[in-house]
From Swiss-Prot:
Belongs to the peroxidase family. Ligninase subfamily. It is found in: Secreted. This is Manganese peroxidase 2. It comes from Phlebia radiata (White-rot fungus). The lineage of its organism: Eukaryota, Fungi, Dikarya, Basidiomycota, Agaricomycotina. Keywords: Calcium, Disulfide bond, Glycoprotein, Heme, Hydrogen peroxide, Iron, Lignin degradation, Manganese, Metal-binding, Oxidoreductase, Peroxidase, Secreted, Signal.
Amino acid sequence: MAFNFAAILAFVSLAAVTSAAPSKTTCSNGVVVPDAVCCDFVPLASALQSEVLMGDCGEDAHELVRLIFHDAIAISQSMGPSAGGGADGSMLIFPTVEPAFFPNLGIADSVNNLIPFLSQFPTISAGDLVQFAGAVAISNCPGAPQLEFLAGRPNATAPAIDGLIPEPQDDVTKILARFKDAGNFSPAEVVALLASHSIARADHVDPTLDAAPFDSTPFDFDTQIFLEVLLKGVGFPGLANNTGEVSSPLPVTDGTDVGELRLQSDFALARDERTACAWQSFVNEQEAMATAFKNAVKKLAVLGHNRNDLVDCSAVVPVPKPATGTPATFPASTGPQDLELTCTTEPFPTLSTAPGAQQTLIPHCSDGTMTCNSVQFDGPATNFGGADDS
């Protein structure tokens, strides 16, 4: 009998591939995932929305997005493992330590809001909870990308040391060095991570202001932040001479409708020759910005871990709300004459200007009202210290 060795080898190879293929599991919501562990996050997403986020890209969402960065960046290649474990949930495991550090002022709110979920979902680690909660939170913001989420981070065994969180008064050289030491982030990746400032607000940079936005559209994940930081400053939304703050182009405040607050670090990164072109490249480039942010967070979220040890549960991350489709626009009272451009190798896009001779107030709440829905659980974390870079 003649044997077809090519056919036999093909069959054996196919059998090997088939046997090595990961099994699939269908979760209760119909989502197919590579591992049953991913299904634990389906009810967690629902609980986060119903108990904290309420489907809104509001203050609670902003704070959870901030937490994914502050937890993960606390790691150092030069100082070694004793400095911090990166994306390990140490903020939640040691809530009386890291939230009290100077750069983490305000982080206690999101820490206390997440701590109850550790007992409610005991199979989910603190590190996974922090990263997943941030992914769920940003999905409420129109235009945001669907973030990758990998599960399986072990719980932190020690808190990170102080001094690893970049601060808004830091110069560009110090900021870039901190990111390189944390995880070999390039200057362009640092800028990409700052797309989160499109939905960020500050509570403590100016002690007289609550929820001061960084751009005029703080409830949309859009490129407006990259335009407005390039405009010349004309005033402050509250007090002047605050550490880490420089004048902004849209400072008008009326009650709880707080004017735009500009971080010194954003101002500097937008104008430094090492980062200016990356910054400018995102103006009116929604898809490019969202993709770059997703890729940078993908790197941030596994600091301190080996990707191969984790399970890809991205399928259970909610699909974000679609972008509004509104192009980047010069706010009323501003225009091309107000641009302060350092990057000369790339043309600046042609943009329209919103009508009006005076600044339009920036709404305090996503629905335009003065009183926003917000949740704040009691907990062990307390706020001390200095500037909040949200």
